[in-house]
Amino acid sequence: MTIQAKPSSSISYDSTTYGTAPGLDIKEFQIIEDWNGRPASAWSVQRIGLLQSKIERYTYNIYHNNKYGKHNLSKLIPGHALIQFANETFGYDGWRMDVIDVEARECQPFTAVNNGENTNTSEVKYTVVAEAQVKVTLKDGTNTQCGGLGRITLSSRGECYNRSKKEAVGDALKKALLSFEKIILDYETKITNNYYVDGLYGSKKIKNEANTNYNLLSATNSKPTFIKLEDAKGTHIK
């Protein structure tokens, strides 16, 4: 038997019950809204749209120039251009980047032979590959995370490590800024399908109700404490 959900139906969290381990009080935890991959306000929707228009104007000639071929946009647009667009769009204090993790994954030494006119010399070089994970957060809480790679070949191992990590962070930052387009497209699709049950954006009223309008059940020494949110829909406790 196949059961299909009605297109107009939506998820409700009215009867959701939250629990904690013995010895913990649910009221000691803060209610936090995580806006990863979702716009937190109309401001971010408008600003991300403006950012995309700047990127499209910059890359129009790139995609219409056959010498570049079909490459990923993050490889064609320079990082300094994206940072400039972000500063112009969100404001210098309207966004920030946090490096979640950066690490050199492999280091491969090899011997490079230099063929001169009269002499043949060899030199040991190193190729280092690094990976980085960064998080870009707008001032209203909208955020996204992306990973990047860096690959550098030099004769100095220490310089290889430093530059490969820097390149990995720069690559991750570019991908994160470019990923805002996908966030908006996905957001518009979910609005069309009535995906959100907690409103289009966060609400201070909802968060205040979540802090006060809960019903604590009695707890024993061997059972965890439970809390039921009756009026606050779509609120997450972390």
Curated annotation (Swiss-Prot):
Pfam families the UniProt entry points to: Rad52_Rad22
Signal peptide start-end: none
Annotated localization: Nucleus
Protein name in UniProt: DNA repair protein RAD59
Main location per the UniProt record: nucleus
Entry keywords, A to Z: DNA damage, DNA recombination, DNA repair, Nucleus
Recorded name of the encoding gene: RAD59
Miscellaneous field: Present with 468 molecules/cell in log phase SD medium.
One GO CC annotation: nucleus
Biological function: Involved in the repair of double-strand breaks in DNA during vegetative growth via recombination and single-strand annealing. Anneals complementary single-stranded DNA.
Quaternary structure and partners: Interacts with RAD51 and RAD52.
Similarity field: Belongs to the RAD52 family.
Source organism, top-level taxon: Eukaryota
GO terms classed as biological process: DNA amplification; double-strand break repair via homologous recombination; double-strand break repair via single-strand annealing; mitochondrial DNA repair; mitotic recombination; regulation of DNA biosynthetic process; telomere maintenance via recombination
